[in-house]
Amino acid sequence: MAGGAFVLGSTGMCGLQMLKAVEKSASFDKVVTIGRRPPSLESPKLKAIVEKDSEKWGEIVEKEAKGFKVLMSGLSTTRGAAGSDEGFYNIDYTLNYAAAKAAKNAGVETYVLISGSFADANSRFLYIKTKGKLEDDVRALKFKRTIIFRPGLILGDREKKKSAGEEFIVSILKYTYGNFLSNITNPIYAKHIGEIATTLASEPIPEDQTEPTVRIIGARELSALGKALP
């Protein structure tokens, strides 16, 4: 299946790793991304669109994703980085949903979303509630195939550095990878998330499939898949 893929969040930890995995994959001959700044990856296969006005992203996705079969999103932030509840919601929900809806209108068949553990639209916690609402609304778009990752602890390097406190906590949690504590933290490297997402997205949809499918991969399953990779 040589074709194109659209990747969102390509300057973030998971999005960048998905972008790298798609770029390396023989299943895709073109990859397009959009952001307020360009990703660190350069490739003849890559078209990186820089648009600081995120309200235009949906329109751009709908135009650029025509003829593509896949859209993958690692677009996400934190309440602290966004500066407010509204800022967080705008990125994690509004931008993601607008792009998903645009992709559906463009004819995209497979949608891959990096969500979060315990995503639940009925939660009273902003992060969990927002992730859950996005999952619910994306599923309602009825792509032929929707794949949702709910990772636990994500390991890897970020372009935007964490605070000293966050770095300390992550440095401690890294030691849970591969030992008995991994059953609690369910760690996975962002690189492996990118590889798994790309592999699943490149699998052909059965010709006799008549109904939309949704696969949710929880933290424990995702961690196991990551550890099985070289």
UniProtKB/Swiss-Prot annotation:
Q: Sorted alphabetically, which InterPro entries does this protein's record hold?
A: NAD(P)-bd_dom_sf
Boundaries of the annotated transit peptide in chain numbering = 1-45
Query: Which pairs of positions does the record mark as disulfide bonds?
Result: none
GO-annotated biological processes: import into nucleus
Q: Which GO cellular component term is one of those annotated?
A: mitochondrial outer membrane
Its placement in the membrane is given as: Peripheral membrane protein
Spell out the Gene3D superfamilies in the cross-references. Answer: NAD(P)-binding Rossmann-like Domain
Q: Give the chief site where it resides.
A: mitochondrion
Q: Which UniProt keywords apply?
A: Membrane, Mitochondrion, Mitochondrion outer membrane, Transit peptide
Signal peptide, first to last residue: none
Compartment(s) of residence: Mitochondrion outer membrane
Instruction: Name the family.
Output: Belongs to the FMP52 family.
Name under which the protein is recorded:
Protein FMP52-3, mitochondrial
Species whose genome carries this gene: Scheffersomyces stipitis (strain ATCC 58785 / CBS 6054 / NBRC 10063 / NRRL Y-11545) (Yeast)
